[in-house]
């Protein structure tokens, strides 16, 4: 399910003394079954784009096309409910959205809200809980009795239970230890392998290099750079001038190249670096 922004602008609290422009004539495409990353500082427009993808915001100007459905300024139609079902949005610290008395009920709530029967919603909930690594003995527990990592998995299972075609992730591993971070990123990688479109908002450039196949760089509400991660991370000085940085291995390789190591291009993953050394 592809997504396209056509000349999209967004203004918060338009027509009030507090209005602020968040996006300026943004044009971009997110291809079906792609893994697209957005990087940029706070205030660059990343969160606004996330909420436009899901129909939580309506463009002030321009058009957001999700599959065959379009959202334009002033739209208040039934298509937005369809879009919210098909584009799952996982906010930073999604465990803060848990509220039901049991894990199973919490995950089943979303599908039921979209008209799925209780029996089918619970079946979906059980399936998605297993998918994210929550064992059956936890299904009837209060979600607030779980560890932080388990709570986050339950919250993500709640999004997956609505069977979205696109999963939008806002700093999904924030606050997790390295093991928990790796497990969660592997889960998203496996979902992508099964055909789900993944949209990742992150400040971790190593994750962009390891998982994404396309990157948008945002600054002050505009797309300033876009391309494949390999292409984007060759622009070390440009990214550092924006205080965004590059993957650790890319910076290390750049230092070696300045000391005389001959590299055809800067590697962006450890595997690439190893191959470059072997054949260098």
From Swiss-Prot:
Main location class: membrane
Entry superkingdom: Bacteria
UniProt-listed Enzyme Commission number(s): 7.-.-.-
Q: Which keywords has UniProt assigned to this entry?
A: ATP-binding, Cell membrane, Membrane, Nucleotide-binding, Translocase, Transport
Where does the record say this protein resides?
A: Cell membrane
Q: Provide the disulphide bond pattern.
A: none
**Which intervals of the chain form a coiled coil?**
none
What is the recorded membrane topology of this protein? Answer: Peripheral membrane protein
For this chain, one GO molecular function annotation is: ATP binding
Which amino acid positions bind ATP, per UniProt?
Answer: 40-47
Q: Which InterPro entries does the annotation name?
A: AAA+_ATPase, ABC_transporter-like_ATP-bd, ABC_transporter-like_CS, ABC_transpr_CbiO/EcfA_su, ECF_ABC_transporter_ATP-bd, EcfA2, P-loop_NTPase
Q: Where is the ABC transporter domain?
A: 3-245
Record keyword Lipid biosynthesis present: no
- GO cellular component entries: ATP-binding cassette (ABC) transporter complex
Which Gene3D superfamilies does the entry mention?
P-loop containing nucleotide triphosphate hydrolases
Q: Which family does it belong to?
A: Belongs to the ABC transporter superfamily. Energy-coupling factor EcfA family.
Q: Which PANTHER family match?
A: ENERGY-COUPLING FACTOR TRANSPORTER ATP-BINDING PROTEIN ECFA2, HEAVY METAL TRANSPORTER
Q: How does it assemble?
A: Forms a stable energy-coupling factor (ECF) transporter complex composed of 2 membrane-embedded substrate-binding proteins (S component), 2 ATP-binding proteins (A component) and 2 transmembrane proteins (T component).
Q: What does this protein do?
A: ATP-binding (A) component of a common energy-coupling factor (ECF) ABC-transporter complex. Unlike classic ABC transporters this ECF transporter provides the energy necessary to transport a number of different substrates.
Q: What is this protein called?
A: Energy-coupling factor transporter ATP-binding protein EcfA2
């Amino acid at each position: 399910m592809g997504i396209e922004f056509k000349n999209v602008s967004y203004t918060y609290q338009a027509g009030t003394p507090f209005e602020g422009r968040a996006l300026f004539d943004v044009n971009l495409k997110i291809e079906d079954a792609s893994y697209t990353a957005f990087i940029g500082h706070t205030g660059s427009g990343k969160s606004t784009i996330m909420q436009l993808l899901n129909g939580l915001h309506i463009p002030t100007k321009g058009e957001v096309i999700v599959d065959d459905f379009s959202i334009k300024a002033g739209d208040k139609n039934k298509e937005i409910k369809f879009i919210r079902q098909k584009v799952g949005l996982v906010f930073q610290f999604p465990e803060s959205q848990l509220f039901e008395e049991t894990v199973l009920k919490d995950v089943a709530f979303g599908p039921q809200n979209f008209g799925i029967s209780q029996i089918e919603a619970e079946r979906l909930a059980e399936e998605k809980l297993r998918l994210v690594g929550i064992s059956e003995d936890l299904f009837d527990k209060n979600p607030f009795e779980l560890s932080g990592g388990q709570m986050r998995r339950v919250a993500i299972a709640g999004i997956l239970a609505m069977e979205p075609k696109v999963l939008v992730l806002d700093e999904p591993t924030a606050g997790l230890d390295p093991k928990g971070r790796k497990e969660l990123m592997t889960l998203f990688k496996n979902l992508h392998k099964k055909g789900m479109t993944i949209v990742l908002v992150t400040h971790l450039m190593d994750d962009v290099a390891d998982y994404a196949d396309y990157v948008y760089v945002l600054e002050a509400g505009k797309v300033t750079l876009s391309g494949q991660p390999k292409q984007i991370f060759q622009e070390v000085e440009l990214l550092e001038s924006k205080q965004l940085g590059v993957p650790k291995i890319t910076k290390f390789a750049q230092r070696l190249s300045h000391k005389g190591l001959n590299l055809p291009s800067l590697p962006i993953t450890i595997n690439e670096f190893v191959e470059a050394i072997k054949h260098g």
